[in-house]
Amino acid sequence: LNEADYVAQNIRTSKDGSSFDIYYKNNLLCNLKIQLTGKHNIYNALSVCASLNEAGVDIDSVKKYFVDFTGMGRRFQHVGSVNEIELYDDYAHHPTEIMAALDAAAVKFGKENIVAVFQPHRYTRLKGLWEDFRGAFDNCFRVIVTDVYAASEDVIEGISGENFAKTLEKAEYMSGNMQSVAQQLFPTLKSGNVVIGLGAGTITFLGKELQNCGENLLCR
């Protein structure tokens, strides 16, 4: 396919999702609405529509499935709420994935409400993509960096969550396991904040630990 055969135009986004027109060779193919936000999700939907159209499927007959689709597990997944604070979990552990996740979050909730909690995954990845990671957190007002999830790797001297946090103006370092991180983070959160855990390790348990804090006076 020529890269210009299928194009998404008139893109409209809100906290409820995205809608856009799909053009095929400059002719309107359909209007599509999805529950997801973020450019990457729009591109994904566009790719699916292109594949279906090439296979001869009537796009209008399957549009409702796009509306019903709420996303994959651990991809900007809503895992609960506590004290009017929304909790999300995302597997993103690469700079481009983090940027995509935070872009979607900012569209839905506003950059000024997003608290990103980043658990670096592997010392070698953090070292190799150090500068790329530093540029991945524009779409949030606050960044929490935890200890590195080693994934069986040996420690690399000088490469740590604490040292990485020092390179970001709006970042803070919080040490320990996810229970400890939640206990440090919870008292600093406010109603309306949206916490999104980012990483491929134990960060996935952060939402549950924050909910536990909401029920535990020791966290306040």
Tell what function each PLM region has.
Residues Y24-R142:
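Nucleotide phosphate-binding/pyrophosphate-handling subdomain across enzymes
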Residues L1-S14, K33-K39, K63-V67, S175-G176:
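Beta-strand->loop->alpha-helix junctions that form or flank phosphate-binding loops
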Residues H93, P120-Y123, V148-A151, A200-I203:
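Short glycine-rich anion-binding loops that position phosphate/pyrophosphate groups of nucleotides
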Residues R12-C30:
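Acidic-glycine-rich active-site phosphate/pyrophosphate-binding loop
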Residues A100, G128-W130, I156-E157, F186-P187, ...:
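Short amphipathic alpha-helical segments
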Residues S180-C213, L218:
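A glycine-rich beta-strand to alpha-helix segment
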Residues V145-V148, E215-R220:
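Short, flexible loop segments at boundaries between secondary-structure elements
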Residues R134-S191:
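C-terminal helical cap/extension that packs against the catalytic core
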